[in-house]
Amino acid sequence: MLKRFVTLALFVPGSVIFAADWALHRGNATQTGVSAEKLPEKLDIKWEFKTKNGIEGTVVISDGVVFAGSADKHLYAIDLKSGQLKWKRLLGILTASPGVNGDRVYIGDADGKFCCLNKATGAVIWTFETDGQITAAPNFDGDNVLIPAHDSTLYCLNKDGKKIWDFKIEGPIYGAVAVAQGATFLAGCDSTLHVLDLKTGKSLGSVDLKGQSGSAAAVYGDYLYVGTMSNQVLAIHLKKLKIEWEFEAPRRKQPFYASAAVNEDLVVIGCRDDKVWALDRKTGKRKWDFLTEHKVDGSAVIVGERIFVGSFDQKLYVLNLKGEKLAEYSLDGAIMGSPAVSGGCLVIGTDKGTVYCLGAK
């Protein structure tokens, strides 16, 4: 339901050119989970790095360094080529994904503290206190950083950690926000998509999602795609601020906690019904589904003609764009985050605290 209408000049090109870095948990500010990287046809495990507790979030990669937050309270910086530790910093329990912007890395913890660190050394530059747990990754608008928190608030801070604005909703915020063309898009536990002006934090409009959302919305062209806890995937027309189509998994009525990966043709999203679903991006019709052995809270990533997605069944699956399995990799624990892709490598963490790097040996 349209609550307020404002015409938005939103033009996110279909053929976005992605940087080699994977500096945000879905690869880009629009949260589409697509990489233009070239990965080897055959992937081998190049190295493993052990932390002392689970990794629930997605690792990020910048300038050949992997940044991983662990529930052992440390943020780790790991060399992408060798898997050797560059530095680690004791913070708080980390279940959120970090984000890199320029020479800084950012992450929030379970106590509601948000930290900005020097990317090269791990030195803490500043911290900001919220009133609720932080499980979402940050996103950025230039030097400004956007932080969703469980205290029902989205915060916008400047590079010095000073609050520019905040926006409150009627429920906790679990997922990251998308950023596109002067606006940020927030789907939260108030069953509403909020469209906000990036500079002021003022509402530009909202859409009733018919269910709570715990994932990041993805913006592609004039449309936004998001899953809900009510067993739905929605496409929202951003100029009209209305639902264009909606999909419900037909049998087991389970929530979509994962974020969607979106390319020109497909919306690919994992569900707690143990399946990965691929929908026609324009119509929402089912193209195919792929059954894993457990729930799929991890978000898929599209790399060329392949889809990479992890499951609670402790496997990383490689599918083609028709949903046919090309390969699978058995890891040491459940996969809750997205793969990160950079430098010809794919990096992913498990709830046993292991970071895996796959590539050409």
Explain the meaning of each model-derived region.
Residues 1-2:
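N-terminal secretory signal peptides that target proteins for export/translocation
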Residues 5-13:
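Sec-dependent N-terminal signal peptides
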Residues 20-46:
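Blade/loop signatures of beta-propeller domains
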Residues 79-82, 118-122, 158-162, 197-201, ...:
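Short loop/turn segments that connect beta-strands within beta-propeller blades
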